[in-house]
């Protein structure tokens, strides 16, 4: 709450808020060790404190009958240093190797949204699927680019992947890498 009250947002805040307003699926993948519930609860606080009434209504309209709480419960929260992450995915990665753990979480999220999008393929309004990943650590950005290019693009050739380097919060747009089929 203090960061919100101080207006101290992360470099991807506007993109995250946009995803929330449109009711897009998302995953919070962080090296931190708090519980997934803490991330979910924090997201709810963020909505409550930063969304105008109009933005909340737009979000509810996009959720087609689901409540904000139901929507948030369907999303992925992967603090890769948490006990919950280790229980779900095993010892690989975690606090000892958060870069690898983040790729495991990204693969899990991508698999979930690709499976969910299969229901939309016949819908004329469906324009395809994009998955975005942002990080403020250049090592994680490079590893994500490599992982997407070598593994995820082979498994999901029709998905458009975007990687955002947020190491310089003033220059996130210029550091957007698009990885799609050639």
Over which residues does each language-model region extend?
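Short catalytic/ligand-binding loop motif for oxyanion handling, primarily in non-cytosolic enzymes
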Residues: 35-39, 139-143, 172-173
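Alpha-helical substrate-recognition element adjacent to the catalytic core
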Residues: 1-96
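Alpha-helical scaffold elements lining the catalytic groove of polysaccharide deacetylases
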Residues: 92-112
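Conserved Lys-Pro-Asp/Glu-containing loop-to-beta segment of HAD-superfamily phosphomonoesterases
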Residues: 105-138
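Extended hydrophobic secondary-structure segments that form protein cores and membrane-embedded regions
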Residues: 27-29, 130-136, 162-166
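C-terminal accessory extensions appended to soluble enzyme cores
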Residues: 143, 157-182
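Acidic, divalent-metal-coordinating active-site segment for phosphoryl/phosphodiester hydrolysis
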Residues: 135-149
């Amino acid at each position: 709450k203090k960061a919100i009250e101080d207006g101290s947002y992360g470099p991807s805040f506007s993109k995250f808020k946009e995803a929330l307003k449109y009711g897009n699926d998302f995953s919070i993948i962080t090296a931190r060790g708090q519980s997934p519930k803490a991330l979910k609860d924090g997201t709810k606080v963020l909505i409550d404190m930063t969304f105008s009434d109009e933005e909340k209504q737009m979000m509810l309209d996009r959720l087609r009958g689901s409540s904000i709480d139901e929507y948030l419960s369907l999303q992925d929260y992967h603090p890769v240093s948490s006990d919950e992450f280790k229980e779900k995915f095993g010892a690989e990665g975690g606090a000892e190797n958060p870069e690898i753990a983040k790729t495991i979480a990204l693969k899990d999220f991508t698999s979930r949204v690709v499976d969910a999008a299969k229901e939309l393929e016949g819908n004329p309004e469906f324009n395809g699927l994009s998955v975005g990943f942002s990080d403020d650590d250049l090592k994680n950005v490079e590893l994500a680019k490599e992982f997407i290019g070598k593994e995820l693009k082979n498994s999901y050739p029709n998905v458009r992947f975007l990687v955002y380097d947020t190491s310089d919060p003033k220059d996130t747009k210029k550091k957007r890498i698009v990885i799609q089929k050639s």
